[in-house]
């Protein structure tokens, strides 16, 4: 009888692990406690993966994790966790307050007689990338649109033509992070007339 060769039982290829990532802080849930958004991370995990939540955050799991610590270390860990949570809440409140106060200015500017451009400033406060928004404006209104630097140090989007009302509607419709109340329409021509009237009077 002929010998039949048996394949050698060598090392198999390593298998990939499936890792769950937190929807709030984007870390694996086991590491959420080191970030500043622990409470939000816990809520997210409880809604999306109850089994993992019970394994990490159940009272039994927490007690087992802190059992080896001394009383002083437990108190210190608790104090640190409260401090981190308070700091994260304060940062979030500050960011929300900043967004409330931020204003997007859509200004119609007269260049020559009956020729206008529309400038849009303040969108970067809402986390929008100006180059992408300028490209969207150009596509939507079939006109030239570019990001330019302002003398005060910031940047604005300049769109060819008088499209200020349409831009306001487009921003409200497409970019939900920008509240309609925070968009201000300004007509530069009227301002020039007012300045001329006050100078003459």
From Swiss-Prot:
InterPro entries: DENR/SUI1_TIF (IPR050318), DENR_C (IPR046447), DENR_eukaryotes (IPR005873), DENR_N (IPR048517), SUI1 (IPR001950), SUI1_dom_sf (IPR036877)
Keywords per UniProt: Cytoplasm, Ribonucleoprotein, Ribosomal protein
Membership in a protein family: Belongs to the DENR family.
Location of the SUI1 domain: 104-175
Subunit text: Interacts with the 40S ribosomal subunit.
GO biological process: formation of translation preinitiation complex; nuclear-transcribed mRNA catabolic process, nonsense-mediated decay; ribosome disassembly; translation reinitiation
Organism, as annotated: Pyricularia oryzae (strain 70-15 / ATCC MYA-4617 / FGSC 8958) (Rice blast fungus)
UniProt-listed SUPFAM superfamilies: eIF1-like (SSF55159)
Cellular localisation: Cytoplasm
Gene: TMA22
Record remark on domains: The SUI1 domain may be involved in RNA binding.
Pfam assignment, any one: DENR_N
Domain of life: Eukaryota
MF annotations from Gene Ontology: mRNA binding; translation initiation factor activity
Any Gene Ontology CC annotation: ribosome
Keyword Signal recorded: no
Protein name: Translation machinery-associated protein 22
Gene3D superfamilies tied to this protein: SUI1-like domain (3.30.780.10)
Xref: PANTHER family: DENSITY-REGULATED PROTEIN, DENSITY-REGULATED PROTEIN HOMOLOG
